[in-house]
């Protein structure tokens, strides 16, 4: 850069600092680039697929999927993991459907969980913004975008046509929220539902879409698609679901990774089941017929018995998890990838 341009830049930077404060503009090399903090999800497979060891703090995350696919279960397990590490959690229950007994079974400390059941979408997002700006919340879940009903819709008549009202509400709220989320280093998770598109579609185009417009798609750093793909049986009794989770978008590591895990009724994501599956894949756990062995010791005949053995011997499970992390965890846990999406497109 020639001297005239350097002087002009120096004058501009000094004027910006006077008007907006020191640090308003800085060179990237002037600050240490820190690894993004992450909150574990409760699923070792998903933490590894996300590439940073969990869901990123200071970012917006969207989790969507069909009904009863495990969306709320996944977020409650993330809350439990955050609380175990001394964090503070908030749950904005726009659906008015949170079951505290089930949350407790998943490890959530319901006595310390901040809960809001707002009447309107505006109230829910205003409460979320105030909690984020307080700087004291580590993780916040909004369940769900589809239930964030605009005030005009609630006060209107049944059958009133109010096109685009919820999409405008979400776009405005996210413009306001994202800066505060980054400054307060809060993880904000939006749970979303699926709807079917109406009209003519191009061949190969998915008929499914999420509610609340396009704003959330652009502002989210991570988007997870979670779906039930099968049942887990113990004899004739169904004890859980086999669930596929796909990382549809990831600004912090390579996207499009997917995992298949087990969600057991009343227990959530089966940590022991994941350890067995990953152990077999990594050849750390030997499978001979129906028997599973680890470190030369038989741990059970059939997956259900092996799962029970690991649950009864937590030190054994912890050793297997440590071996798996050593084998699977990437050496570079955080890499911010460029995203060419412009926020103007979200409007």
UniProtKB/Swiss-Prot annotation:
<dbReference type="InterPro" id="IPR027417">
    <property type="entry name" value="P-loop_NTPase"/>
</dbReference>
<dbReference type="GO" id="GO:0140664">
    <property type="term" value="F:ATP-dependent DNA damage sensor activity"/>
</dbReference>
<comment type="function">
    <text>Can catalyze the hydrolysis of ATP in the presence of single-stranded DNA, the ATP-dependent uptake of single-stranded DNA by duplex DNA, and the ATP-dependent hybridization of homologous single-stranded DNAs. It interacts with LexA causing its activation and leading to its autocatalytic cleavage.</text>
</comment>
<dbReference type="InterPro" id="IPR020584">
    <property type="entry name" value="DNA_recomb/repair_RecA_CS"/>
</dbReference>
<dbReference type="GO" id="GO:0005829">
    <property type="term" value="C:cytosol"/>
</dbReference>
<dbReference type="GO" id="GO:0016887">
    <property type="term" value="F:ATP hydrolysis activity"/>
</dbReference>
<dbReference type="Pfam" id="PF21096">
    <property type="entry name" value="RecA_C"/>
</dbReference>
<keyword id="KW-0238">DNA-binding</keyword>
<dbReference type="GO" id="GO:0003697">
    <property type="term" value="F:single-stranded DNA binding"/>
</dbReference>
<feature type="binding site">
    <location>
        <begin position="65"/>
        <end position="72"/>
    </location>
    <ligand>
        <name>ATP</name>
    </ligand>
</feature>
<comment type="similarity">
    <text>Belongs to the RecA family.</text>
</comment>
<feature type="region of interest" description="Disordered">
    <location>
        <begin position="327"/>
        <end position="347"/>
    </location>
</feature>
<keyword id="KW-0067">ATP-binding</keyword>
<dbReference type="GO" id="GO:0006281">
    <property type="term" value="P:DNA repair"/>
</dbReference>
<dbReference type="InterPro" id="IPR020588">
    <property type="entry name" value="RecA_ATP-bd"/>
</dbReference>
<dbReference type="InterPro" id="IPR049428">
    <property type="entry name" value="RecA-like_N"/>
</dbReference>
<keyword id="KW-0234">DNA repair</keyword>
<keyword id="KW-0233">DNA recombination</keyword>
<dbReference type="InterPro" id="IPR023400">
    <property type="entry name" value="RecA_C_sf"/>
</dbReference>
<feature type="compositionally biased region" description="Acidic residues">
    <location>
        <begin position="337"/>
        <end position="347"/>
    </location>
</feature>
<dbReference type="GO" id="GO:0009432">
    <property type="term" value="P:SOS response"/>
</dbReference>
<dbReference type="InterPro" id="IPR013765">
    <property type="entry name" value="DNA_recomb/repair_RecA"/>
</dbReference>
<dbReference type="InterPro" id="IPR003593">
    <property type="entry name" value="AAA+_ATPase"/>
</dbReference>
<dbReference type="GO" id="GO:0006310">
    <property type="term" value="P:DNA recombination"/>
</dbReference>
<dbReference type="InterPro" id="IPR049261">
    <property type="entry name" value="RecA-like_C"/>
</dbReference>
<keyword id="KW-0547">Nucleotide-binding</keyword>
<keyword id="KW-0963">Cytoplasm</keyword>
<dbReference type="GO" id="GO:0003684">
    <property type="term" value="F:damaged DNA binding"/>
</dbReference>
<dbReference type="Pfam" id="PF00154">
    <property type="entry name" value="RecA"/>
</dbReference>
<feature type="compositionally biased region" description="Basic and acidic residues">
    <location>
        <begin position="327"/>
        <end position="336"/>
    </location>
</feature>
<keyword id="KW-0742">SOS response</keyword>
<dbReference type="GO" id="GO:0005524">
    <property type="term" value="F:ATP binding"/>
</dbReference>
<dbReference type="InterPro" id="IPR020587">
    <property type="entry name" value="RecA_monomer-monomer_interface"/>
</dbReference>
<keyword id="KW-0227">DNA damage</keyword>
<protein>
    <recommendedName>
        <fullName>Protein RecA</fullName>
    </recommendedName>
</protein>
